[in-house]
């Protein structure tokens, strides 16, 4: 070590004569590194597993104790409590006057029933009006036949006039008929392809 210090002193003196900068260095002997303390224990994995399992069990124990303190209900207990609550509410509400919500719900049911009966009555009224319309059309056909027979026209003209179904009246009352009911629901009348001039000539002959 004394020789090293002498070398360092000499170098420092020479450098000091050249400039103000001093440069010194020393050598240290590094001994062999031993890894004996860093070696893993033979049962370190087993010890770590059991320690982790113990920590997990303790943690779950605290979690379960907190859940039981908050009072999380079980399903069986919840169903029995709901049944008891329903029975108690029924018994308590049996003697009380009706609440406004229940009254409104019953009024809504009654209104829906009245609307349904009104709809049925309207349908029956429409059916009756259609039946009356058909009977009046038949009566008008019979009256037309009698008038033509009394006038003495031939049977061909009678048959020709019978093809046309002309209603005697049109009811425009909107209370009984809708817009679709005013339309004639009978099939369209297909006229013969013969022109009227030929038929008139045949009648004259």
Curated annotation (Swiss-Prot):
Membrane topology: Single-pass membrane protein
Residues bearing PTM Phosphoserine: 89
UniProt source species: Homo sapiens (Human)
GO molecular function: corticotropin hormone receptor binding; identical protein binding; signaling receptor regulator activity; type 1 melanocortin receptor binding; type 3 melanocortin receptor binding; type 4 melanocortin receptor binding; type 5 melanocortin receptor binding
Stated name of the protein: Melanocortin-2 receptor accessory protein 2
Chief location: membrane
Family according to the record: Belongs to the MRAP family.
Task performed by this protein: Modulator of melanocortin receptor 4 (MC4R), a receptor involved in energy homeostasis. Plays a central role in the control of energy homeostasis and body weight regulation by increasing ligand-sensitivity of MC4R and MC4R-mediated generation of cAMP. May also act as a negative regulator of MC2R: competes with MRAP for binding to MC2R and impairs the binding of corticotropin (ACTH) to MC2R. May also regulate activity of other melanocortin receptors (MC1R, MC3R and MC5R); however, additional evidence is required in vivo.
Clinical disorder: Obesity: A condition characterized by an increase of body weight beyond the limitation of skeletal and physical requirements, as the result of excessive accumulation of body fat.
UniProt GO cellular component terms: endoplasmic reticulum; endoplasmic reticulum membrane; plasma membrane
Name of the coding gene: MRAP2
Outcome reported for the amino acid change (mutating residue 125 to C): Found in a patient with obesity; uncertain significance
Coiled-coil stretches noted in the UniProt entry, renumbered to this chain: none
UniProt-annotated glycosylation sites, renumbered to this chain: 9
Record-annotated membrane-spanning stretches: 45-65
């Amino acid at each position: 070590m004394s020789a090293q210090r002498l070398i360092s002193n000499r170098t420092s003196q020479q450098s000091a004569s050249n400039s103000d900068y001093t440069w010194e260095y020393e050598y240290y002997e590094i001994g062999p590194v031993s890894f004996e303390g860093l070696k893993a224990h033979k049962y370190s994995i087993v010890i770590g597993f059991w320690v982790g399992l113990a920590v997990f069990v303790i943690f779950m124990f605290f979690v379960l104790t907190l859940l039981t303190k908050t009072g999380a209900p079980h399903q069986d207990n919840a169903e029995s409590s709901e049944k008891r609550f329903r029975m108690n509410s029924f018994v308590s509400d049996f003697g009380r006057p009706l609440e406004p919500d229940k009254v409104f719900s019953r009024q809504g049911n009654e209104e829906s029933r009245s609307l349904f009966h009104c709809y049925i009555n309207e349908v029956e009224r429409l059916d009756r009006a259609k039946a009356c319309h058909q009977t009046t059309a038949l009566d008008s056909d019979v009256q037309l036949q009698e008038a033509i027979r009394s006038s003495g026209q031939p049977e061909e003209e009678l048959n020709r006039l019978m093809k046309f179904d002309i209603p005697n009246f049109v009811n425009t009352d909107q209370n009984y008929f809708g817009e679709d009911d005013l339309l004639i629901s009978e099939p369209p009348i297909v006229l013969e392809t013969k022109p009227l001039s030929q038929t008139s000539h045949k009648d004259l002959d």
